[in-house]
């Protein structure tokens, strides 16, 4: 029997690197007990997987999808979007459905100055000469 080469498979999978990834993944699947779709002919699993790709008994798109799923560490879950929060001070801000108003607390200038007096000034650090 003639040996399977990359040239036999390159018209099925355009990129040689993708072909190697897919064939290796299929060979691991065969090693873990997945049934083969071509005669083994005393060939090893990587050769059998290349022959399956060349004979189109296995779809490369399906292999690619299985490879991606096998490499995923986290399952993507579609979570609901959080409620949108209107921007503060935007002129066209939408009003909530329940029409509740937000109470804004006003400070006088004297209250503001008293609050600022309570703050400690930042410590001055000596300037370093270079």
From Swiss-Prot:
It comes from the Bacteria. It is an enzyme of class 2 (transferase). Signal peptide: none annotated. Residues 110-130 are annotated as: Disordered. It holds the Pfam family RNA_pol_Rpb6. GO terms for biological process: DNA-templated transcription. Promotes RNA polymerase assembly. Latches the N- and C-terminal regions of the beta' subunit thereby facilitating its interaction with the beta and alpha subunits. GO terms for molecular function: DNA binding; DNA-directed RNA polymerase activity. This is DNA-directed RNA polymerase subunit omega. Keywords: DNA-directed RNA polymerase, Nucleotidyltransferase, Transcription, Transferase. Belongs to the RNA polymerase subunit omega family. GO terms for cellular component: DNA-directed RNA polymerase complex. It comes from Afipia carboxidovorans (strain ATCC 49405 / DSM 1227 / KCTC 32145 / OM5). Its EC number is 2.7.7.6. It catalyses: RNA(n) + a ribonucleoside 5'-triphosphate = RNA(n+1) + diphosphate.
């Amino acid at each position: 029997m003639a040996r399977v080469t990359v040239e036999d498979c390159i018209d099925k999978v355009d990129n040689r690197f993708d072909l190697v990834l897919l064939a290796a993944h299929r060979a691991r699947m065969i090693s873990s007990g997945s049934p083969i779709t071509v005669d083994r002919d005393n060939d090893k699993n990587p050769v059998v997987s290349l022959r399956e790709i060349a004979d189109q008994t296995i779809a490369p798109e399906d292999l690619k999808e299985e490879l991606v799923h096998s490499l995923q560490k986290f399952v993507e879950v579609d979570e609901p979007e959080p409620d949108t929060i209107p921007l503060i001070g935007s002129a066209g801000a939408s009003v909530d459905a329940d029409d509740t108003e937000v109470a804004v607390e006003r400070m006088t200038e004297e209250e503001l100055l008293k609050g600022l007096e309570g703050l400690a000034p930042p410590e001055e650090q000596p300037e370093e000469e270079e």
